[in-house]
């Protein structure tokens, strides 16, 4: 399974902010580290998030809730989740509106 690294997510965030607007920068490096590694937590030698989809959901959720960046946390949470799925061979076929409603709603 391929993982996204912290430097990759920071680069994605900077590109996203440049394209969509907002303030670039990390607000809390520890919260970023926590968010990026949360999908790979183990308990008793077993992954807490067993499926690729569960890991992707946890990555997106953690980036949104931990708020590690100054701005654009919801945007990077969704983008990181989609990229994580894609690099692992899963491409979503939902509409942009579905994504927005599920992320914000």
Task: Describe these PLM feature segments.
Residues 1-105:
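FIC/Doc superfamily catalytic core
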């Amino acid at each position: 399974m391929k993982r996204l690294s912290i430097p990759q997510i920071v680069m994605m965030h900077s590109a996203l902010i440049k394209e969509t607007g907002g303030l670039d920068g990390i607000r809390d490096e520890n919260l970023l580290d926590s968010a990026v590694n949360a999908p790979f937590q183990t308990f008793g030698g077993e992954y807490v998030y067993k499926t690729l989809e569960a890991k992707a959901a946890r990555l997106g959720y953690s980036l949104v809730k931990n708020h590690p960046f100054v701005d654009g946390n919801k945007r990077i949470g969704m983008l990181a989740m989609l990229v994580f799925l894609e690099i692992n061979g899963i491409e979503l076929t939902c509409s942009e509106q579905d994504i927005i409603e599920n992320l914000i709603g």
